[in-house]
Amino acid sequence: METGHPPSLQELCVVVLMRHHAQLEDIGHMPYALVRRVLLKMSAEQLLRLERASPALLLEDEEAWQQLLKKDFPTNVHEVWVARKKDVYEYYLESVRELGPQVLEDRALVRSLLRAAVCKDPVLFKYRVPSRQLYQRYVHEDARRQELSAARLRQSTLQLQQEKQKTRITQLEDPLYLERELNAGRQRAAPQRSSIYLKSFKELRQRQAHFRSGGYDPTQRRIVRVQTPSAQPAASLHPPPQSAPMAGSPQKPAPPEQPLAASPTPEAPGPLAQRRRPSARRQPPPASPAKRRSALFSSPALSTLLPQQDDTDSDTGGRPPKKPRVYIHTPR
């Protein structure tokens, strides 16, 4: 646009289209040179929408697709060459046939557009692959990579969920009842115990089997009290009083009491006697108490009582005399 001259109608229309390029749906049979600046501002989706409305635009928008290829796939290869010219022709004709087969009826127009779009490089002597074809190829490859990544992510997520299900803690309504029901049909494996535990457990079973009451209870033991010598009642030095004999009843003589013989204190054997072995000879049994002579008859108090016995015989008049009562007090 030159300064000093008012803008033309074509320039004003291009400015309006550039301001509202997102709302552009169809350009009809407008030449590419008029809408070039508008097409360079569009995205890939908008450009495809215009190609569906105007199929002949597909043979002229190589510059717009090349700019989109560099913008959306900056790391990919932007120029690919093929040796056969027929491959490029077949791609263009197939694309036009999909969008609008009525365009192919004008053979002269199609031939002129193809001749301008397909050019041989003077250095490589090859034909350049259309940028539109490269863009679509990269889009499909990117979608395939995303699909593979999503599949791997789903697989890893599924494995994590399965591992969580294995170690998941489930809450039971009645765990005691279910435990009895499960343990009724199978035997639980015995856990590995140490030798010290098994030994103590065996001793506990032996004690329980011995007492038959589950163990020793110190609170239920029987207490037996033994009387000490100081708590025993002291022996009386005097005999208990006896009731007087009735007249006319014969009195039985009391058996004489034998004195308690003091047991000799054993002396400690000497060192030579301790070394001697016990003799194998049989010792004579001790004499029975009945054969021992009582010391009552050798007591001096008996001689003093004999004259009195004679006097009593004369007084009784032939009746058997009463035997005297003799009390022997043995000092302790």
UniProtKB/Swiss-Prot annotation:
**Domain of life according to the entry:** Eukaryota
Query: What Pfam family is a match, any one?
Result: Elongin_A
What cellular-component terms does GO give this entry?
elongin complex
Question: GO:BP terms for this protein?
Answer: transcription elongation by RNA polymerase II
The family line of this record is: Belongs to the ELA1 family.
Q: Which PANTHER family match?
A: TRANSCRIPTION ELONGATION FACTOR B POLYPEPTIDE 3
Query: What protein is this chain from?
Result: Elongin-A
Q: Which gene encodes it?
A: ELA1
